[in-house]
Amino acid sequence: MSDDLNDFFAKKDSTKKVVKKPTSTTPKVVVKPVSPTTPVVSPTTVTSPVSPTTPVVEPKKVVDLSQLNKSKDTTPVVDVKESKTEQINIPTMRWADKNEQTTTTTQTKVYKNYPSLKKEETKVDEDDDQIYEDKEEEKEVKKDEENSTADEEPVKKSNKKVAPKQKKKSKQELEAEALMASLGIIDEKPVPKQKKK
């Protein structure tokens, strides 16, 4: 890499000369000296093109820094989430009073499905009184409208149950009922049962 940098800067500066190290492409023959204690003579061996005078160049390793940072974090993400949700309730601490008002997971699911069930609590700061006054008035108007529509709907449903539609009677049936009523004879017909829908 340093050779590349030198080449780069040498091209920029014309006064510097580019000097490259000569590399041999032919394999060199290395002869091992024979020691007097060994009776076997070793033949000459051919080694790799790297000469013993030049240092062995190891391939450079690419280090992923994100992996190093991940290895330092020994706690998984799930544990962090659980530790945030679990707070110890100490009554002598001020922040513990706020913890008493927490809701369970089933309550939050119900509130998501039916937002009208959730009690709206307004927290007002002293500096923001004017901003929240208008919003509170709008909420009260909406609540009044919801209450009025909620009151009207059950009345409509109860009226439907109390007064089912009656069939129109023909003139002959009306005359027959009038005669029977005048004579005091009451026509007792069994009430037909309504079909369930």
From Swiss-Prot:
Biased amino acid composition, Low complexity: 21-30
Biased composition (Basic residues): 157-170
Residues covered by region (Disordered): 1-30, 115-174
Full protein name: Uncharacterized protein DDB_G0289955
Start-end of Acidic residues biased regions: 123-137
